[in-house]
């Protein structure tokens, strides 16, 4: 690409009344704009070719700090858009050469975009994570060796056995709660998907993540969904609810489809 400015596409939506909320800013602080083509609207923003042309973008995507900033700006636009319409979020760094490229992207992906928007209309995404937390027994097992030596060998072994049984009980309770909760939430939701558990070493969140799921829920049933999550409780188990979000996990367009459509728009 040779132009200094490219068009970053945040999302696709249907035409809607009103405007984007004031103060909505995307990549580089650039306010997003709406580009209508037929029965679809692309939400775009100008970005520098020096960062988003194909070669520099590959390098930028290896920079975790830059990537995190871009993801936050991307999500800010989607969140603002969600207050006025139902958006179909596109993947991070979907870039076209110019407005003509954006129009080609809408044309080439038209049927997939329409199907996905029909599926998402009136629905939001909720995230649910379940963690098995180290209980007091496990902490007891990890007492300093000096303290362990103060007790007899029999007492020490008894304490370790009790800690192990307690820890196994935590895992069993967490597993049972995950199965029960996922079944109940799936009945309340239009769709659900289970993601790979988070690594505590990377997330910094205490406990072991045993369920990392997302659910597509009608707005009208969101209160019922939240109450189901709030009612889930077991000793040694923590349940975390996030949302409501724009339905990233249920965009309904495979990564390869988005990539092909993106390439057509360049």
Curated annotation (Swiss-Prot):
Cell compartment(s), UniProt: Gas vesicle
Additional notes on this entry: This strain probably produces some gas vesicles from the probable gvpO-gvpA-gvpF-gvpG-gvpJ-gvpL-gvpS-gvpK operon; it can be induced to produce more under certain growth conditions.
Pfam family, one: GvpL_GvpF
Summary of the function given for this chain in its UniProt record: Might be involved in nucleating gas vesicle formation. A minor component of the gas vesicle. Gas vesicles are hollow, gas filled proteinaceous nanostructures found in some microorganisms. It is not clear what function gas vesicles perform in soil bacteria.
UniProt protein name: Gas vesicle protein L
Keywords noted in UniProt: Gas vesicle
InterPro entries on file: GvpL/GvpF
Organism annotation: Streptomyces sp. (strain CB03234)
One GO location term (cellular component): gas vesicle
GO biological process annotation, one example: gas vesicle organization
Location (main, coarse): other
């Amino acid at each position: 690409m040779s132009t200094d400015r490219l068009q970053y596409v945040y999302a696709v939506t249907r035409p809607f009344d009103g405007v984007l909320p004031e103060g909505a800013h995307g990549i580089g602080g650039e306010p997003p704009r709406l580009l209508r083509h037929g029965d679809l609207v692309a939400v775009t923003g100008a970005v520098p070719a020096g960062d988003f042309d194909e070669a520099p973008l590959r390098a930028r995507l290896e920079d975790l700090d830059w990537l995190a900033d871009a993801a936050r700006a991307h999500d800010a636009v989607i969140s603002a858009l969600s207050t006025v319409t139902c958006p179909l979020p596109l993947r991070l760094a979907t870039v076209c050469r110019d407005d003509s490229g954006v129009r080609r992207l809408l044309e080439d992906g038209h049927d997939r975009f329409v199907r996905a928007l029909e599926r998402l209309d009136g629905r939001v995404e909720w995230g649910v994570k379940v963690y098995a937390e180290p209980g007091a027994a496990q902490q007891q097992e990890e007492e300093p060796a000096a303290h362990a030596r103060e007790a007899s060998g029999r007492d020490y072994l008894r304490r370790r056995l009790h800690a192990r049984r307690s820890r196994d009980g935590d895992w069993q309770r967490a597993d049972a709660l995950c199965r029960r909760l996922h079944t109940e939430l799936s009945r309340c939701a239009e769709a659900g998907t289970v993601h790979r558990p988070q690594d505590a070493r990377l997330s910094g969140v205490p406990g072991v993540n045993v369920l990392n799921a997302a659910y597509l829920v009608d707005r009208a049933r969101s209160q019922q969904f939240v109450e189901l999550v709030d009612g889930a409780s077991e000793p040694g188990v923590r349940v975390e609810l996030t949302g409501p979000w724009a339905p990233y996990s249920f965009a309904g367009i495979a990564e390869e489809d988005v990539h092909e459509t993106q390439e057509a728009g360049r």
